[in-house]
Structures are given as structure tokens and as C-alpha cells.
A protein has these predicted regions:
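Acidic, metal-coordinating helix/loop segments flanking the phosphotransfer/catalytic sites
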Residues: 32-48
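Conserved acidic segment of CheY-like receiver
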Residues: 1-11, 17-18, 49
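Conserved phosphotransfer microenvironments
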Residues: 14, 47, 51-69
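Receiver (REC) domain switch/output surface
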Residues: 85-102
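Two-component/phosphorelay signaling modules centered on CheY-like receiver
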Residues: 11-29
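A short, hydrophobic beta-strand element within the central beta-sheet of small alpha/beta folds
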Residues: 49, 64, 73-83
Length: 102
């Protein structure tokens, strides 16, 4: 089963993304901050990470760069709260299936 890291400080948004991905058969690990995301990357194996457009205490780009240094094999997808969830899920499915890169 492919694992996805979902990072979002807003629990309702994070949980909505997690449920949608779980519905497609993914194992989802949730992180409520950039610090938690870094910890989870050290502890797990992921094919992709979903980052929000806004983070407290750091930028999405800084976290993306850090994750890229720690685990370059992970595809990173940035998802804003106004973006369509079904497109995110399709993108993650395409990454899993080897059809697309982030």
C-alpha cells in the first residue's frame, strides 16, 4: 500500500484530504505542522507529500526544499483550500501509477 504524507495545520482540511486519499486505497499519515512533517519523513516511507499553500513559521517552498533534501524520491504536491480535491486525488493516483510526476 502506498503511503502519502498530508501536511496541513487546519485539521478539517487535512482530514478531508486524508479521507479522499484513503478512499483510493492509500495509507495516509497526517502532520499538523512543518516540524511534524519533517519528523514523519524520518520515520516513514512515502511516495508523495501534500503540502498546503500556507504554513505558520515557514514557507511551503522552504518545507518543500527540506523534504527534497531529506527524501528526493518523494513527489511533493501543493494543494490550496480552494483547489479541487478530486484533481489532487487524481494527481496522487497518477504518481502512484507512474503516469505523472508532481
Amino acid at each position: 500500500m502506498s503511503s502519502i504524507l498530508v501536511v496541513n495545520e487546519i485539521s478539517t482540511e487535512r482530514e478531508e484530504i486524508a479521507r479522499a486519499l484513503q478512499g483510493e486505497g492509500f495509507k495516509v499519515v497526517e502532520a499538523d505542522s512543518a516540524t511534524s512533517a519533517v519528523r514523519e519523513i524520518w520515520e516513514g516511507t512515502f511516495i508523495a507529500a501534500v503540502l498546503p499553500t500556507l504554513l505558520t513559521g515557514t514557507s511551503t517552498q522552504a518545507l518543500q526544499d527540506q523534504l527534497g533534501q531529506m527524501a528526493p524520491e518523494i513527489e511533493v504536491v501543493v494543494h490550496g483550500k480552494n483547489d479541487e480535491l478530486h484533481r489532487l486525488v487524481r494527481k496522487i493516483c497518477d504518481i502512484r501509477d507512474g503516469v505523472a510526476a508532481a
